[in-house]
Every structure is written in structure tokens, then in C-alpha cells.
Amino acid sequence: MADEAQAPPAEGAPPAEGEAPPPAEGAEGAVEGGEAAPPAEPAEPIKHSYTLFYFNVKALAEPLRYLFAYGNQEYEDVRVTRDEWPALKPTMPMGQMPVLEVDGKRVHQSISMARFLAKTVGLCGATPWEDLQIDIVVDTINDFRLKIAVVSYEPEDEIKEKKLVTLNAEVIPFYLEKLEQTVKDNDGHLALGKLTWADVYFAGITDYMNYMVKRDLLEPYPALRGVVDAVNALEPIKAWIEKRPVTEV
């Protein structure tokens, strides 16, 4: 008796027990003969060209330099002199610095640049909510810096003296007490209970704030001091601090 013809399995039906499923059409790694092709080599990470433009001071650019150091990222640290600045100013996006050039494209806004670099070195949050926690702290630190700067750069001595009273008696204690408690609530960090770019930003900007008020702001705040000390002790940042140009600001 002739063998009974067997109907082909319906489209999409599972293979019979012990039968290997055929590779999907166009499936990666499928080759004639059923042998899998070796996995593709991982793509080389894209390397970008970075140039940072600022004056020969720490100030607003130092958090960016800290982030470059943390990520062992090569960049050109262009330190513009006061004499060079008038000719260079019209070439900058908003006629100010710091400016970061990425693959030939110039961008401004130091906080935005720091956030961008933090993403490239793995110091951001894992979710939008975590990123929000970091952003809140960084924006608070920047608000504090701006309140100090308004007083520090006041040109009228009499007005400046009055502003200093409020700054020292109210503004500085308010912000630093809040930030001190934030660190205590986050296991020695400014956000998420771990190292993030909020810690690095704060450590990088502290010298500038101390310069503006002409004293060590963190002396009465051991938790905040601990954040700065821990960041400055990280090997790549420690190496940067040891080799960076010595500047007043």
C-alpha cells in the first residue's frame, strides 16, 4: 500500500515534537544548511571631538572639566585670554562662554552641557523620574550660585554691603541647610543615594562660590563637605586636580 500523503502543517503551526523550527525568513544568522552564522562583531563606539572654550579660570567650566576627567574623555581645553575674547565673542552662540564644541558644532548653557556630558559618562538616572531628582538638585545649586553672584558682582559698595547682610544671614544658611539635609537623606550623595552628576557638578562649582564669598562655605556643613571630598578623591578627577592650571578663581 502506498504511503498515505501527509498534509503540510498549517501556516504558523508549531513544529512537531523533536523537529527544529525553520529559521524565519530573513532571520539574522540563518545560513543554508541550518548552521548559525557567527554573531556580528560589536560596533566600535562612536568617538566625538570635543573642544571647551572658557577663560583661564575654574568658575562655570570646572564642572564640565570634572565630567570630562571622570569619563577619561579627551577634549581640547581652550583657555581664552581677555585680549583674545573681543575677536572671539561674535563667533559664540550667545556671545558668552563657556561654550562646548561637539564635532564642530558649538553649544552654550553650562547646565545643559553638563547634563549632556553626564549622559555620555553614565552619571544620569535610569528613568525620567531619577533624572528629575538630579535636575532638581543641580538647578537648586545653580539658583544658589546666582544669588551669590548678584551680590559678589554688585558694583556699588554701599548697595553691596546691604546685600551681603541678607546673603550671609538668610540666603546662604537657607540653601546650605537644605542641601546638607538632602545629602543626609541620600546616603552621602545629593541624589538617588549614589554618585550622579549632581555630586560632580557641586564639587566642581564649589571653589567658585567660595571665591565669591571669600570663605569656605562648607565648613559648617560636614555632609556637603563629604560630597566634595569624595568626588575630588575619585582617581580620574584627583589626577585632573593635580595637573590643572593653577588659577585664582
Swiss-Prot record:
UniProt KW Transferase keyword: yes
SUPFAM superfamilies: GST C-terminal domain-like, Thioredoxin-like
GO cellular component assignments: cytoplasm
Region Disordered, residue ranges: 1-42
Keywords: Detoxification, Transferase
GST C-terminal domain segment(s): 127-249
Domain GST N-terminal: 48-125
Feature: compositional bias, Low complexity: 1-38
Keyword GTP-binding: no
E.C. designation(s): 2.5.1.18
Pfam families documented for this protein: GST_C_3, GST_N
One GO term (biological process): glutathione metabolic process
Major enzyme class: transferase
Listed GO MF terms: glutathione peroxidase activity; glutathione transferase activity; prostaglandin-D synthase activity
Swiss-Prot/TrEMBL catalytic activity: RX + glutathione = an S-substituted glutathione + a halide anion + H(+)
Subunit structure: Homodimer.
Protein family membership: Belongs to the GST superfamily. Sigma family.
Annotated function: Conjugation of reduced glutathione to a wide number of exogenous and endogenous hydrophobic electrophiles. May be involved in the detoxification of metabolites produced during cellular division and morphogenesis.
The name this protein goes by in its record: Glutathione S-transferase S1
